[in-house]
Structure formats: C-alpha cells, structure tokens
C-alpha cells in the first residue's frame, strides 16, 4: 500500500471514495457497480439519520373520549358460561358412564 499523507482528512484518502459518482439510478448495472451502491440500492440498507416522526397529538376534548369508552358494553367472557367447576363435573360423569373395559 502507498503511504497516506497524514495531513489529509480520512474521507479524502485515496480509495475512500468510489471511482464513479453514485447516482439515483436503480438499474442492475448501477446497483452492482460498487459495494456502497450494492448495500444502499441493491439491499436497501442505509445507516443515515432517520427522521423523527411527529406523534399525533390527542384531541383537546379528551374527556369525551373517556366517556365514550365507558359506554361500551363489557366484553363477554369466553368459554363455558356455566363456569369451570360444572364442566369438570360433566367430564367426571361422562367418564363414569363410559367404561372402556
């Protein structure tokens, strides 16, 4: 390797930049022309800054939203409405009446 001038900034070192400038073309030839273009264009990986998304602000009338939630009917319990104790008794009765011997 050739010695690098220590006064040069690292991004200006020879070989630090691709020989041809990157462009916005996404054709196969441009996507595969160097490793940087392949990762950015071909694989879609970019490590740049991500823009912060603004969170949606709650409406000013937040109390009415709480009231509308309380008016909704309570969710129905799933499963056997009689309860788990009675269903166990049913299973016990069925096993007694069906002898497998």
Curated annotation (Swiss-Prot):
Q: Provide the residue span(s) of the region labelled Interaction with the host capping enzyme RNGTT.
A: 49-86
Where does the record put the Glycyl lysine isopeptide (Lys-Gly) (interchain with G-Cter in ubiquitin) cross-link?
A: 71
Q: Which InterPro entries match?
A: IV_Tat, Tat_dom_sf
Q: Where in the cell is it found?
A: Host nucleus, Host nucleolus; Host cytoplasm; Secreted
- Post-translational modification as stated in the protein's UniProt record: Asymmetrical arginine methylation by host PRMT6 seems to diminish the transactivation capacity of Tat and affects the interaction with host CCNT1. Acetylation by EP300, CREBBP, GCN5L2/GCN5 and PCAF regulates the transactivation activity of Tat. EP300-mediated acetylation of Lys-50 promotes dissociation of Tat from the TAR RNA through the competitive binding to PCAF's bromodomain. In addition, the non-acetylated Tat's N-terminus can also interact with PCAF. PCAF-mediated acetylation of Lys-28 enhances Tat's binding to CCNT1. Lys-50 is deacetylated by SIRT1.
Its domain of life reads Viruses
Residue segments, region Disordered: 1-24, 45-101
Q: Which HAMAP family match?
A: HIV_TAT
Q: Self-association or partners: how does it assemble?
A: Interacts with host CCNT1. Associates with the P-TEFb complex composed at least of Tat, P-TEFb (CDK9 and CCNT1), TAR RNA, RNA Pol II. Recruits the HATs CREBBP, TAF1/TFIID, EP300, PCAF and GCN5L2. Interacts with host KAT5/Tip60; this interaction targets the latter to degradation. Interacts with the host deacetylase SIRT1. Interacts with host capping enzyme RNGTT; this interaction stimulates RNGTT. Binds to host KDR, and to the host integrins ITGAV/ITGB3 and ITGA5/ITGB1. Interacts with host KPNB1/importin beta-1 without previous binding to KPNA1/importin alpha-1. Interacts with EIF2AK2.
| Role of this protein | Transcriptional activator that increases RNA Pol II processivity, thereby increasing the level of full-length viral transcripts. Recognizes a hairpin structure at the 5'-LTR of the nascent viral mRNAs referred to as the transactivation responsive RNA element (TAR) and recruits the cyclin T1-CDK9 complex (P-TEFb complex) that will in turn hyperphosphorylate the RNA polymerase II to allow efficient elongation. The CDK9 component of P-TEFb and other Tat-activated kinases hyperphosphorylate the C-terminus of RNA Pol II that becomes stabilized and much more processive. Extracellular circulating Tat can be endocytosed by surrounding uninfected cells via the binding to several surface receptors such as CD26, CXCR4, heparan sulfate proteoglycans (HSPG) or LDLR. Neurons are rarely infected, but they internalize Tat via their LDLR. Through its interaction with nuclear HATs, Tat is potentially able to control the acetylation-dependent cellular gene expression. Modulates the expression of many cellular genes involved in cell survival, proliferation or in coding for cytokines or cytokine receptors. Tat plays a role in T-cell and neurons apoptosis.
Name of the protein: Protein Tat
State the organism of origin.
Human immunodeficiency virus type 1 group M subtype B (isolate OYI) (HIV-1)
């Amino acid at each position: 390797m050739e010695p690098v001038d220590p006064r040069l900034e690292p991004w200006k070192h020879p070989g630090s930049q691709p020989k041809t400038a990157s462009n916005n073309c996404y054709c196969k030839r441009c996507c595969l022309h160097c490793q940087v273009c392949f990762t950015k264009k071909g694989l879609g990986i970019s490590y740049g800054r991500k823009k912060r998304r603004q969170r949606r602000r709650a409406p000013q009338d937040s109390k009415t939203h709480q009231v509308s939630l309380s008016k909704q009917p309570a969710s129905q319990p799933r499963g056997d409405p009689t309860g788990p104790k009675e269903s166990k008794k049913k299973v016990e009765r069925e096993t007694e009446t069906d002898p497998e011997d």
